[in-house]
Amino acid sequence: MKPKTQREVKGGLFLISETRPEQVFTPEDFNEEQLMMKEAVIEFVDREVWPNKERFEKKDYALTESLMKKAGELGFLSIPVPENYGGMGMGFVSTMLVCDYISGATGSLSTAFGAHTGIGILPILLYGTEAQKQAYLPKLASGEWFGSYCLTEPGAGSDANSGKTKAVLSKAGTHYEITGQKMWISNAGFASLFIVFARIENDKNITGFIVPLEENNGIELGEEENKLGI
């Protein structure tokens, strides 16, 4: 009799599992460390974000990049990243505290922040190899690099798995060559690392690839879309 194996679910578990009472938290449950983080992010938003709200909505991407770097210096980008990868390892509640206050100020900065700390960092944190985590997470956690998540295509949005971008193993077998087009990619204009989804030959599902921005990797960026400053 073969032993039963259960696949580990990484990310999105809240979508398929029941919420337990011990998982529920309220502001009254915040500990001293979380309250300190709350005060720090409120001060950052009041000083740096609110006074510049109109500039964000008018496509001032240089300002967005500048404040993202400041957020990295203050540790706001590294909260969910474990300490051994250059992060603060403060957990879910502290992460949500920071996201809550940053997202309440302007959709432009909150989108850049969420794209970096969420779909930019988490794919590597949850699914990357140990070597990939050591190589990329410290740079993303500090704000030295910004991440971008390249999923949507001109003909693939809600049905993301229908994307046409292809990944073909090189003749030497050392790397994959990716060909395709992506669109509406948050942070693409100032990202140093892209999580690019492509299909390997006839695979049923698409695969995520870590693609650093380098001169010889063939990435071409199109013109920025005017989407309410996002």
Task: Write out the residue ranges for each language-model feature.
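Amphipathic, small/basic residue-rich leader segments at the start of a protein or domain
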Residues: 1-112, 132-135, 139
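Buried hydrophobic positions in well-ordered alpha/beta secondary-structure cores of metabolic enzymes
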Residues: 34, 45, 75, 82, ...
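Cytochrome P450 C-terminal beta-domain/meander region
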Residues: 70, 159-179
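N-terminal glycine-rich flavin-associated loop
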Residues: 111-131, 157-160, 169
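A short, Trp-centered hydrophobic/proline-enriched beta-strand micro-motif
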Residues: 143-151
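A generic structural motif
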Residues: 152-154, 168, 197-201
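A short core secondary-structure module
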Residues: 174-223
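Short, intrinsically disordered, charge-balanced linker/junction segments flanking boundaries
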Residues: 227-230
